[in-house]
Amino acid sequence: MAMTGLNTAGSDRDYDTQSLNRELQDKGFLLTTTEDLINWARTGSLHWMTFGLACCAVEMMHTSMPRYDVERFGVAPRASPRQSDVMIVAGTLTNKMAPALRKVYDQMPEPRYVISMGSCANGGGYYHYSYSVVRGCDRIVPVDIYVPGCPPTAEALLYGILQLQRKIRRTGTITR
């Protein structure tokens, strides 16, 4: 039974939408928004680019191998930043390499995401107190997901990629 009245306009609209949705589903149609459709497509077709600077890059390669096969989740590697949605920064970022990282990030199309992989990329790691090390790649580019570890396992990176997909589904791409 539907509620009616001055203060229940939202409830009436929700009830009408739900009944319309059920009726269309019975006939084989799907009722959704454009934003939900875009988010669904974006999470299923992420293209990542490696920015491997040290030993974490080896674990990044393991993620693409047959044991973990990250491509089954709709994530595929790309060689060019212009074709990439996600940049995975893995390893120690030095002051000399920081401008190159920013340049590659700026070449990526919007919306773009960054995964910081390993202790060195997250906060400088073992070389934190060195004069030539940037203490976290988040000082150069905005980071969406941090994957801890030295080096993090392929499972940890895979979990980080899945968390990024959840974040995209939750926050959306139009409002980012």
UniProtKB/Swiss-Prot annotation:
Cofactor note: Binds 1 [4Fe-4S] cluster.
Subcellular location: Cell inner membrane
One Pfam family matching this protein: Oxidored_q6
PROSITE patterns named in the record: COMPLEX1_20K
Gene Ontology BP terms: aerobic respiration; electron transport coupled proton transport
EC number, as in UniProt: 7.1.1.-
Keywords, sorted A to Z: 4Fe-4S, Cell inner membrane, Cell membrane, Iron, Iron-sulfur, Membrane, Metal-binding, NAD, Quinone, Translocase, Transport, Ubiquinone
UniProt keyword annotation of NAD present: yes
Main localization, broad class: membrane
Topology in the lipid bilayer: Peripheral membrane protein
Catalytic function, reaction form: a quinone + NADH + 5 H(+)(in) = a quinol + NAD(+) + 4 H(+)(out)
Residues binding [4Fe-4S] cluster, per UniProt: C55, C56, C120, C150
GO annotation, cellular component aspect: plasma membrane; respiratory chain complex I
Keyword 4Fe-4S: yes
Any one GO molecular-function label of the UniProt entry: NADH:ubiquinone reductase (non-electrogenic) activity
Function, in words: NDH-1 shuttles electrons from NADH, via FMN and iron-sulfur (Fe-S) centers, to quinones in the respiratory chain. Couples the redox reaction to proton translocation (for every two electrons transferred, four hydrogen ions are translocated across the cytoplasmic membrane), and thus conserves the redox energy in a proton gradient.
UniProt similarity note: Belongs to the complex I 20 kDa subunit family.
NCBIfam families per the UniProt record, alphabetical: nuoB_fam, PRK06411.1
Record-linked PANTHER family: NADH DEHYDROGENASE (PTHR11995), NADH DEHYDROGENASE [UBIQUINONE] IRON-SULFUR PROTEIN 7, MITOCHONDRIAL (PTHR11995:SF14)
Subunit structure: NDH-1 is composed of 14 different subunits. Subunits NuoB, C, D, E, F, and G constitute the peripheral sector of the complex.
Name used for this protein in its record: NADH-quinone oxidoreductase subunit B 1
The gene coding this protein: nuoB1
